Amino acid sequence: MKSRLFIISQYLLPHHLLSRLAGCVAECRARWFKNAFTAWFAKRYQVNMSEALVEDLSAYEHFNAFFTRALKPGARPLDETPGAILCPADGAVSQLGPIEHGRIFQAKGHGFSAQELLGGDPAMAAPFMGGEFATIYLSPKDYHRVHMPLAGTLREMVYVPGRLFSVNQTTAENVPELFARNERVVCLFDTERGPMAVVLVGAMIVASIETVWAGLVTPPKRELKTFRYDEASRAPIHLEKGAELGRFKLGSTAIVLFGPEQVRWAESLGAGSAVRMGQLLAEPVQA
């Protein structure tokens, strides 16, 4: 009954208004408030501050600075397996596996369109048909920066407007097309394993998504917008494997897509597996 009421509330709540209000709270610089709120959050979610570059909670200028905190050098060593594809973020594997008939598995019989996830462009989605996906959920306690699974050159970024349903097991099992309905930022790279998409999916109270090359991407005007980076007039944007790609200010999910016959997921990983940025996510399929 509680789950049913929760799902009903997800459809009724003003997602964007609540998220913008949360963003204002998270940027509050009043010392008494930000210190108390940050301390409560760190205790409530058992955040490991010993690995943070700045361990003193009161040193952060606002909650968002704490939430997107940097880690100490070496806190996330990169897997050195030859050709390794790295996990892009801390969190848990929600699902991973093949993209079948253009669909990505969500939970308990629910799936969503890879084309819709990427913004609806058939040409962008085509290289990933028959390929592989991995969905990583970042919990409140996790490190909330997203890094490159492979070295790549940015070709395109797409802001896709949408709802901001909460992202958790309950919504994954009960909200159809969840990740293809929520607001998201699609980043398309050219890599040694062919095209790679990294999709940063928003959720309720996710106030914004940033990338290292564009800064704040959401919230702009809520309309689909494509940014091309492969034009001759632009200097190429190349990011090395393990380099920071972007970050969430309050939460959510990263989805990685590869084309067919390019990667093989690590045998130790499955739905529910805890992961850390930099660990082995997949190995290359040898030609």
From Swiss-Prot:
It comes from Pseudomonas putida (strain GB-1). Its main location: membrane. This is Phosphatidylserine decarboxylase proenzyme. Belongs to the phosphatidylserine decarboxylase family. PSD-B subfamily. Prokaryotic type I sub-subfamily. It is an enzyme of class 4 (lyase). It comes from the Bacteria. Pathway: Phospholipid metabolism; phosphatidylethanolamine biosynthesis; phosphatidylethanolamine from CDP-diacylglycerol: step 2/2. The keyword Lyase applies. It holds the Pfam family PS_Dcarbxylase. GO terms for cellular component: plasma membrane. Its cofactor is pyruvate. GO terms for biological process: phosphatidylethanolamine biosynthetic process. It is a peripheral membrane protein. Binds 1 pyruvoyl group covalently per subunit.
